[in-house]
């Protein structure tokens, strides 16, 4: 017992760990026959934090193999097997390069990635999922909002600021993060010839991104403050940040065809229909060369900074149905969880899923259009359900998806009647 008396007869309490008296510390916490002071509590917290951090670092040290990365992507992203393989290898090599600095003097270059695919094919989701499996900070940027320094819009350094925000301004963590720049095709040069006038949202942005993607020390104001001369900047080295750029590149297949048609002019040339199917477009994109991207409007230096290029196919009806049901966080599972919170089961019939997929194909939004379709279908039900009592199940069939009828509500009493009827 850490107690003792003083001359006045009052008992002085002492910390059972460090021996300091109650007068030497701010707070003394009493337990059964022991006392602990606030200083010892703080010290214990520090020890626990350090051990947790060390354990976390040990866990992070193991880099998953390309197969493991691809298998993890399969849990969240449907299809796009070739793109997954390319990404898995590129990301594995990138982080292996960071973990094992070359001892034989061979300097390993950084392999940034370019994803080409239609809207809603899974470009953003692939990049997000990669960051999740590797447990690294992830930031997204829209290339259309970027401008050259000094013009109205976002500076390219703002991308690094977003990355810092994701890891509480831990510079070391940010320097090993992943940055995804979407709509990269929208900053293509407006013509083949270098622009005489300023192109602040096209070629100018490509020039500004060059150094950032290749590797430079970016100066970022701390905690999102505005830039001013007296302020100390955070210095972030972008050499080890993996940049993934994505875009739809509409019309790129025509650029590739023009190039290939030049080599097959004459009697041996095959006549091609004006309209191309999705499979034909995918085959054409498979013949992509760096010169095609330059012809499209990316400057040669920018194309050179993105050595790993892979294409994603447009999702068909079967793939969209799989996206609705198969992934861990599939949309139907998300809405079923919402309805479960209200005590109701949500059921999607097979023909309803087909109708939803067909609607998404009509809108040409790919997987991105699925959520808005489901939101519209379930809006009235989600509005009414919290006010209704005894709704056991909500059923969605094809007619509901096509707007011909309302969702079927099955009440608790109806289920009891049908159950008793079957017994009789």
Swiss-Prot record:
PANTHER family assigned: ATP-DEPENDENT CLP PROTEASE ATP-BINDING SUBUNIT CLPX-LIKE, MITOCHONDRIAL, ATP-DEPENDENT CLP PROTEASE ATP-BINDING SUBUNIT CLPX-LIKE, MITOCHONDRIAL-RELATED
GO molecular function terms attached to this record: ATP binding; ATP hydrolysis activity; ATP-dependent protein folding chaperone; protein dimerization activity; unfolded protein binding; zinc ion binding
Listed SMART domains: AAA, ClpB_D2-small, zf-C4_ClpX
Amino-acid positions noted as binding Zn(2+) in the UniProt annotation, renumbered to this chain: 15, 18, 37, 40
Protein name in UniProt: ATP-dependent Clp protease ATP-binding subunit ClpX
Family: Belongs to the ClpX chaperone family.
Pfam family, one: ClpB_D2-small
GO cellular component: HslUV protease complex
Cystine crosslinks: none
Residues in coiled coil: none
HAMAP family the UniProt entry points to: ClpX
Entry-linked InterPro entries: AAA+_ATPase, ATP-dep_Clp_protease_ClpX, ATPase_AAA_core, Clp_ATPase_C, Clp_protease_ATP-bd_su_ClpX, ClpX_bact, P-loop_NTPase, Znf_CppX_C4
Subunit structure: Component of the ClpX-ClpP complex. Forms a hexameric ring that, in the presence of ATP, binds to fourteen ClpP subunits assembled into a disk-like structure with a central cavity, resembling the structure of eukaryotic proteasomes.
Residue span, ClpX-type ZB domain: 1-56
Origin species: Legionella pneumophila subsp. pneumophila (strain Philadelphia 1 / ATCC 33152 / DSM 7513)
Keyword Nucleotide-binding on entry: yes
GO process annotations (BP): cell division; proteolysis involved in protein catabolic process
Domain of life of the organism encoding this protein: Bacteria
Described function: ATP-dependent specificity component of the Clp protease. It directs the protease to specific substrates. Can perform chaperone functions in the absence of ClpP.
SUPFAM superfamilies xrefs: Glucocorticoid receptor-like (DNA-binding domain), P-loop containing nucleoside triphosphate hydrolases
Binding site for ATP: 118-125
